Amino acid sequence: KPAVKTKSVFSEQADQILYQIRRFGSKMATAYSMTQDSKTSGEQAKCLTLLASAERIFYDRLDDAIRSASMFDETEYNAFCRGSISFGDKEEAKKKKEIYDGIVSTVNKVVHDNERLILRLDSLAYALNQRSAQNPWDTDVVLAMTKLDTVISKTEEDIKQDEEISKEAMKRYDTLNGGN
């Protein structure tokens, strides 16, 4: 948290992330509570697995944002944007800009991914709360679980893709710094 909060470039995202953490905790507590009332052990097991995955993904993404923001040199970035400093030739400057843009993009993507996760979690909790006692496998619950599972899977794919992009960016960064 502090790494994101101390950099003005990320102040809006930091506020959103803090708000998301509070909401996520509340939604998880509600969903866990509603899961305890599940009518079948199959539904309960599926919900608990999804909730554990949602929690892992949410906090992994927060970790990504914090790590990315920690790497961000705001002083250098601001000087670069003002034109006070340059990084040699245009190619080096372009690579450096791509790195900065990538870090900002990662933090924004985490906020987006976690918001999407919270909304799906909310839908699941609502469906669990509204389900009919006569039909333990209420279609709304199944649909909400499926949508949450889809968001989790999509986010996991995005994380893998982000890791590949980061590896490439770090290779470029290493070449910029002479391999140090």
Where are these regions (language model features)?
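Membrane-proximal, non-transmembrane interface segments of integral membrane proteins
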Residues: 2-90
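Soluble C-terminal extramembrane regulatory/interaction domains of multi-pass membrane proteins
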Residues: 66-180
